[in-house]
């Protein structure tokens, strides 16, 4: 029984701390809400690379 509890707690700890790797140099994002570095890197025509406070994402550009 105690082995089950230890394995369960270990598995829970691993899953809770598992996060996708943050790639600050992400490229090739060709849809909305994907990380980008600059407009030329990954945003389609009519989109701009805009900061959301933490990361940058491709968003529609509605004007000059």
Curated annotation (Swiss-Prot):
It is found in: Secreted. GO terms for molecular function: calcium channel regulator activity; potassium channel regulator activity; toxin activity. Expressed by the venom gland. Residues 19-27 form a propeptide. Disulfide bonds join 29-43, 36-49, 42-58. Its main location: secreted. Residues 1-18 form the signal peptide. GO terms for cellular component: extracellular region. The keyword Transmembrane helix does not apply. Keywords: Calcium channel impairing toxin, Disulfide bond, Ion channel impairing toxin, Knottin, Potassium channel impairing toxin, Ryanodine-sensitive calcium-release channel impairing toxin, Secreted, Signal, Toxin. May increase intracellular calcium release through the activation of nuclear inositol 1,4,5-trisphosphate receptors (ITPR) of cardiomyocytes, thereby causing an increase in the contraction frequency of these cells. The presence of a 'disulfide through disulfide knot' structurally defines this protein as a knottin. Belongs to the scorpion calcin-like family. This is Putative calcium channel toxin Tx758.
């Amino acid at each position: 029984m105690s082995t089950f509890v230890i394995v369960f707690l270990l598995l829970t700890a691993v899953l809770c701390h598992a996060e996708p790797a943050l790639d600050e140099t992400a490229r090739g994002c060709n849809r909305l809400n994907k990380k980008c570095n600059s407009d030329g890197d990954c945003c389609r025509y009519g989109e701009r690379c805009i900061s959301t406070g933490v990361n940058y994402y491709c968003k529609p550009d509605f004007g000059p």
